UniProtKB/Swiss-Prot annotation:
Inhibits the vertebrate potassium channels Kv1.1/KCNA1 and Kv1.3/KCNA3 in vitro with an IC(50) of 5.3 nM and 50.0 nM respectively. It is found in: Secreted. Negative results: is a weak beta toxin because it has no effect on Nav1.2a/SCN2A voltage-dependent sodium channels when perfused at a concentration of 100 nM, but when added to the extracellular bath solution at a concentration of 1 uM it shifts the voltage of activation toward more negative potentials. Has no effect on the Nav1.5/SCN5A voltage-dependent sodium channel. Administration to mice produces no toxic effects. CDD domains: neurotoxins_LC_scorpion. Has the structural arrangement of an alpha-helix connected to antiparallel beta-sheets by disulfide bonds (CS-alpha/beta). Disulfide bonds join C40-C63, C49-C68, C53-C70. Residues 25-80 form the LCN-type CS-alpha/beta domain. GO terms for cellular component: extracellular region. Its main location: secreted. This is Beta-toxin KAaH1. Keywords: Disulfide bond, Ion channel impairing toxin, Neurotoxin, Potassium channel impairing toxin, Secreted, Signal, Toxin, Voltage-gated potassium channel impairing toxin. Residues 1-22 form the signal peptide. Expressed by the venom gland.
Length: 80
């Protein structure tokens, strides 16, 4: 029981440290030619969003809030 409690405390501490010092990666929602965001599902890593982000000139993206989000997408590259 004591080992389980100690393990749980360690996991919680590492989770807190990761959320405090975690990298906040900049990015943007890419827009199509009609100034609309690209809708997506399922949430998380999504092949469609990765493809869209590559069209916008960045390497990685994912589905967040049912819209594609591209990491490191600058404001000037948002619209195709």
């Amino acid at each position: 029981m004591m080992k389980l409690m100690l393990f749980s405390i360690i996991v919680i501490l590492f989770s807190l440290i990761g959320s405090i010092h975690g990298a906040d990666v900049p990015g943007n929602y890419p827009l199509d030619s009609s100034d609309d965001t690209y809708l997506c599902a399922p949430l998380g890593e999504n092949p469609f969003c990765i493809k869209i982000c590559r069209k916008h000139g960045v390497k990685y993206g994912y589905c967040y809030a049912f819209q594609c989000w591209c990491e490191y997408l600058e404001d000037k590259n948002v619209k195709i």
